[in-house]
Amino acid sequence: SYVPAQIVTNDDLSKIVETNDQWIRSRTGIGERRIATDDSTSDMAAKAAARAIEQAGIDPEEIDLIILATSSPDYCFPNGACEVQAKVGAVNAACFDISSACTGFVFALSTAHAYISSGLYKTALVIGADLLSKLVDWTDRSTCVLFGDGAGAAVVTAAENGIIGLNMHSNGAKGGVLTCGSRSTGNFLLGKKPELGYMTMEGQEVFKFAVKQVPECIKEVLEETGNTAEAVSYTHLRAHETSQDL
């Protein structure tokens, strides 16, 4: 993993919006977040990737697939995975990005699992990286207390004791509950200039959706794999972590 050095505490945020350390901690469990001052999304992704490669004890040229999950790429194109490829020297890898916000890494991992299971690729580098500080409205208390910048990476290969089961769902009808507008909304023919889109969230709706749907997904994957909740350690469950309450 990799996080930038700059720390923004809850007390720092209390100088920007009407909030305080106790309010944030009691509702989210968050005490501080990291904010990038010099790193780009691909910089953070590459630094996390380099650490994962080193820990895996492999040569970067052994990697034949790179999947980067991000909602804040450096460019529209080339994709961020290609930038990571160049920075870590994984010259033999096919590269693409996945945009799925909070669930991005889970979707990227499941995609790598499918490719490796099919035999098409052998060694995948899966990365989740976001520079959300540039998408957050720092005057919006409902979002600015929740998000920061950072990256995590994993080297994925086939193994007998690997992924036991997957359960993926989407509900596009709820997309407006947590969203960030496109920054290419201008139209030169109509004289409309692009507007900066910032993240917006209906917190209660997100909470209600998560507490209902996530347990159902867990139940489904347990049934599909012939397991029970009692038999599975939480350390073997990979899901999006939102806050201490969720």
Which residues does each predicted region cover?
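Phosphate/pyrophosphate-binding loops at sites that engage ATP/ADP/AMP, CoA/4′-phosphopantetheine
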Residues: 48-63, 217-231
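Short beta-strand segments
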Residues: 69, 99, 124-130, 156, ...
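Conserved small/polar residues in nucleotide/adenosyl-binding loops
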Residues: 235-242
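Condensing-enzyme catalytic core mediating Claisen C-C bond formation in acyl metabolism
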Residues: 1-38, 140-208, 212, 216
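Flexible, glycine-rich active-site loops centered on histidine and acidic residues
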Residues: 117-151
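Conserved catalytic cysteine-centered active-site region
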Residues: 23-27, 31-43, 71-124
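Short acidic capping loops at alpha-helix termini that bridge into adjacent secondary structure
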Residues: 59-65, 92-94, 122-124, 228-233
